[in-house]
């Protein structure tokens, strides 16, 4: 798996901020495979969620994120690509992004995704604002890799300097869904995934 120098630089600069200023606490890192591909699916409360989600896994793991296509303007697109992200068109089924994610997962990469699709409205805590997207589960099923749930807390209160927390859980059981119609299997796998994410979030 190729390593991104830009990702390493961002991680080094972020380390004292997250662990010093925000006292980042992480548990369950052993649930995320180090060598094999996987899909890491997390709740989404802030644009800063990728920050505490990825740093506790570094340097053993560099996450590959889907970045909304609206961010792909020069020179920001160069930094995004250098950090290992790839574009996705939000609000529509992006076949190219899905195929890219499946290929990367099969190659041993950890694909980070947010099934809620967008950040939650302020004040929404437990209920998901909209029907969760099935893309994360679909990618895990098609790539035949583990589907790992995760949850972050505190990224919506950065100005208050509240402590950041992240938890990673054991892989969601989806082996019994493989071989079924992909669309139907993805819906069931997503339901299981969101239950696990809610449980992790409640434990933080």
Mark where each language-model region is:
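Catalytic core of membrane glycerolipid acyltransferases/transacylases, capturing the structured
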Residues: 10, 19, 33-92
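N-terminal membrane-anchoring alpha-helices
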Residues: 1-25
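Membrane-interface helix-loop junction between the first two transmembrane segments
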Residues: 25-35
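Residues at the C-termini of beta-strands that transition into short coil/loop
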Residues: 30, 69, 89, 151, ...
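A secondary-structure boundary/capping signal
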Residues: 28, 67-68, 84, 114-116, ...
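Short gly/ser/thr-rich secondary-structure transition/capping motifs
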Residues: 19-27, 95, 150
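Non-catalytic C-terminal accessory region of glycerolipid acyltransferases
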Residues: 2-6, 96-204
